[in-house]
Amino acid sequence: MLDLITKTIDLRKGNPEQKRREILDYFEKTWAIDEKLYTQLKSDDVFYHRGDPLRHVLLFYFGHTAVFFINKLMLAKIIDIRINPEFESIFAIGVDEMSWDDLNEKHYNWPSVDAVRDYRQKAKQIVTDVILNAPVNLPITWNDPLWIILMGIEHERIHLETSSVLIRQLPLDEVLPGLFGKICDERGIAPTNDFLPVPGAELNLGKSFDHPLYGWDNEYGHYSEKVEDFKATKFLISNGEFLHFVNDGGYKTHEFWTKEGWDWRNFKQAEMPFFWRKNSKDYSLRLVAEEIPMPWNWPVEVNYLEAKAFCNWKTIKEGKTFRLPTEAEWIRLTEIFRIPDELEWESAPGNINLEHFASPCPVDKFQNGDFFDLIGNVWQWTETPITGYAGFKVHPLYDDFSTPTFDGKHNLIKGGSWISTGNEATRQARYAFRRHFYQHAGFRVVESETDLKIHNDEYETDHEVANSCETNWGDAFTTTTNFSKQLADYILETVKNKPIQRVLDLNADTGRLAFELAPHFEIITALDASARFIRMPIQLQEKGFIRYIVKDEGELVFYREVVLSDFGFETNKENILFMQDNANNLKPIYTGYDLIVVPNLLEELVCPIILLKHIHDRLNENGMLIIASTYQWDNHHTKREHWPGGFKQDGEPITSLEGIQNILSEHFSLEKSPIDLPLTYRKSSRINELLLSEVSVWKKK
C-alpha cells in the first residue's frame, strides 16, 4: 500500500515535462489504489450487490470512475471517439438520493465484471495517451486539458472513499480482510474529553483561482465571517463517550432529536450507531472488511442527525449550549494551530491519506496543538449546509458537481478521514452529504452561547439557471410572450384527437413546457443533461416554489419567486417524471413514447445528427415528433461536420430544415408546414434577445 501513497500536485511550480510525469504518476497510482479497493470483494458475484439500498450495485462504481474520464474528455473535445456508448450511459450518473436519480434496477442490464475490467483497461490507455500528448502550460488552470485529467483523478479518489463505505455495508461473509492496508491495533478505554477555549477572529473563507492546487468549484470565491469565542472538545467524540448517550436512552427519547432526526430514527428503528454490533454481552465494530472488539477510544462514526441528538442530549443534561462546529469554527481551529496543508507534509499530521492506518485509530493518538485530530481519523460533521461563496461559478465541464447540493439539505464535513486522499485531504476541501448519510464521519462538540450563523443562499444565483428561470417563468412578472406556453398550445392543437398518452420532452430546462403539457397526457418524461437545471422543476414539483435572482441594471437585481399554484399547475404535477440524461447518449429505458418533443435542443448538442438518426427507435408506431430549433449552430458546441444544415453543399445552400428532412425522411413524413414562434431570452430588465424558433411536426411512418 505504501508504494501507492501520493499527494495532490502543485500546478504552478516545475517545468512542463516534469509536471507531465507527476500527473502520469498521480493518475497511475490513483487507478491502482481504486482497483485495489475492490480486491476486498470475496467474488465477482458481489459486484452485483448493493452496500446500501439507496445506492447502485458496486459494479456501477467500478465502471463509473473510468467512464467519467471518457465522458469528460469527450465533453471537452479532447477525444472524439467513445469506447462503448452503452457503458458511457449506464455508468455515467451516480446517486445522491435526488428525485432525478434512477435506482430502478429494471432499467439496468449490468454487463459482466470482466467486460467492465476490459473497459477500464481501454479507458486507462486513452487517459495515459492524453497525459503524454496534451500540451502542458504552467500554471495549469481549469481551462487546460490536464485540468480535466486532474478532475477525473480527484473524482476517482472521492469514490475510493465513498465506495469503501459501501463495501463496509456489505455482509461480512462477502468481503475479505487484510487486502487493503493495515488496520490500527491500538485499543483502550476512552479518554476524558475536556472543553478547551478557542479565541474568535474575523475569518476570510474561500480561495482564489490562482491557488496552486486543484480544487472543486465550491472552494473558490470569498466569504467573510466573524467567529466569536467558543469552546471545543479536545478530542473527537469517542465510541466510549457516545455509549453514555446510548445507555441513557438517547435513541429512544424524542426530545433529543430534531424532527428530521426523529423521523429518520423511527424509519430505521436505530438503537445505536450503524457500524456498531452487539451480542448478548459485548459490542464490536464493523470496519470495511472485518469486525473487531469495540475500540472505545476510537472516534464514533455517525450521521449528522445522531451527532446533533448527542449535542442536544448533552445540552439538556448539563444546562449549557452544545452543538456541532460551523465550517468557520473548524477553519478557525486549523488556523490557530497552523495545520499544514498537504504539500507541506513530510508525514501526514493525522490519520489521513492512508499514510498510517486503513481504519480509524484512538482519538488521543495524533495531537495538533492543544487539540487532537483536527484533521484525519474521521470526517467531522458541521452545522453548515453547503452553499457557494460569493464569486462562485460552476466549471463548464462539471456543472453539477456542487449546485445540486446547494439545497440546505447537505451539511459540510471537514477534516478528512484515514482514507481521504488528494483534494479530500487539503485544508480547503468542501464536501457535503445528506444529514442521514453515513461516511467515515464523526464529530467534535462546541460550547457556545452565540447564535448559530448559517450562510445559506435561498435564491438561485447561478447566472445561466436564473436566466433560464426568467425565460421560462418570467411572464409572471413581465409582458414578454412565453415561448414554452406558445409551444405547448401549438402541440395540443396539433395532436388533438390523437391517441397520445406518453410524452418525452428531451430538453426539460427549468420545466415550463412539461408543466404546461402535464394536464393533457398520462405521463410526461422530461429530461435534461444538467442537474443544475433539472433541480429547479424538481423543486417546483416537490416544494411548490423556486426563487432566483436576475439582473436589473448595473448592480441592481430582482429577487423572483415563482409559485407553481399561481400558474394552476399543482393538480397534475405528479404526471411528470423529471430525470437527468444526455439526449446524445440516452439510456435504453427511454422508449415507447407516443410523442417526442425536442425543444431548442439540437443547437446545444455535440452531434444532433446522431439524435435525429435514432429518434424513431424511441417512438411507438404512428408516433409524433415535434422539433423546435433556432438553428443557431456554433462550432463551440457542435462541430461543423455535425450540423444537419445551415451550410453550402456542392455550391448549393442546404437549410437546417432541409438537412433535418433528409435525415428523418426514411422513418418520418413532414405532417404540416413549419411555423416560427418567437423565443425571448430575458437577460436583464432592459436587455431582451429575440429569436425565432422554427417548429416542425413529423409522423413516424
Stretch-by-stretch model annotation:
Residues 152, 156-158, 166-186, 191-215, ...:
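Functional-site microenvironments in short loops/helix caps that host divalent-cation chemistry
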